[in-house]
Amino acid sequence: MTKAVLTSISQLALKALLYEVSLSPKPGLVDRFDNGAHDDMSFMTFIDSMIALSPFFQAYIETGFAYAKEEPLLLFNRLRQLGQKAEETMFCATQGINTHKGLNFSMALLLGTTGAYLARTPHLMTDLGRFSKEDTLAICRLVKPMTAHLIQTDLGHLNTKKEFTYGEQLFVTYGIKGPRGEASEGFTTLTDHALPYFRQMISQNDPETSQLRLLVYLMSIVEDGNLIHRGGIEAWKGVKADMRLLLQQDLSTTDLRLALSSYNQCLINQHLSPGGAADLLALTFYFAFLEKLL
């Protein structure tokens, strides 16, 4: 019974990734229609990546459930070790292309804390239909004590390094903390902005329209390391401003799709991709499935 419940939730995480890549059109991003601003990946690359990651999603939630009473830092270390194996498997499946590195990190933490939370809330294990937004908040709060050390541990000693990873370079150049920053703050962009906005949208619109509007909203607020890496601070600010204007127009679904298709070409021309917004889109979908919003 327990394994079946945990499996069903890990499948919601996989489903969230499938929904994210399938949502179309997404400016600058890989979707069903085209590869956005990416020359090295396609819709099928994402499918390969998801299949590779899927067993690890199961491992994350089972680890959280099994070690729910463990010290937060010890649980974090277990999840990170699993996450590193998952990352290696992903890169093998995609021939070295980074499809889900940051999202895998976030999913490891959130599935791990979902498992730990469920171990402490047996009523949800017997009836997931009772899962509420309060449970979402509680799960995200569990991440913070696991990750409070991350910025100092991972990014605090970069002055001694000569070569940087993509995430480290963003921190050194711009102070952008990326997925580590989101995690160390308990995913507040997700809990305080993305999910409240989506709950409102889904109560007023059909699912596809709600998802497209959520994407636009996220592109208007997220500190997007992907955009900054590709185009710099000004390009990122420009995308945010454009998306704020698009939100204010309150377009019909048909006109919104047309506007996003047009903007897709703009971002392709500039080689810009809002990957940070895409990751938060998938994380929002995960909790939307748990809360039965979708």
Swiss-Prot record:
Catalytic activity annotation: 3'-dephospho-CoA + ATP = 2'-(5''-triphospho-alpha-D-ribosyl)-3'-dephospho-CoA + adenine
InterPro entries tied to this protein: CitG (IPR002736), TriPribosyl-deP-CoA_syn_CitG (IPR017551)
ATP-binding as UniProt keyword: yes
GO biological process terms, semicolon-separated: prosthetic group biosynthetic process
Keywords carried by this UniProt record: ATP-binding, Nucleotide-binding, Transferase
GO MF entries: ATP binding; triphosphoribosyl-dephospho-CoA synthase activity
Known EC number: 2.4.2.52
Family: Belongs to the CitG/MdcB family.
Protein name: Probable 2-(5''-triphosphoribosyl)-3'-dephosphocoenzyme-A synthase
Species per Swiss-Prot/TrEMBL record: Streptococcus pyogenes serotype M2 (strain MGAS10270)
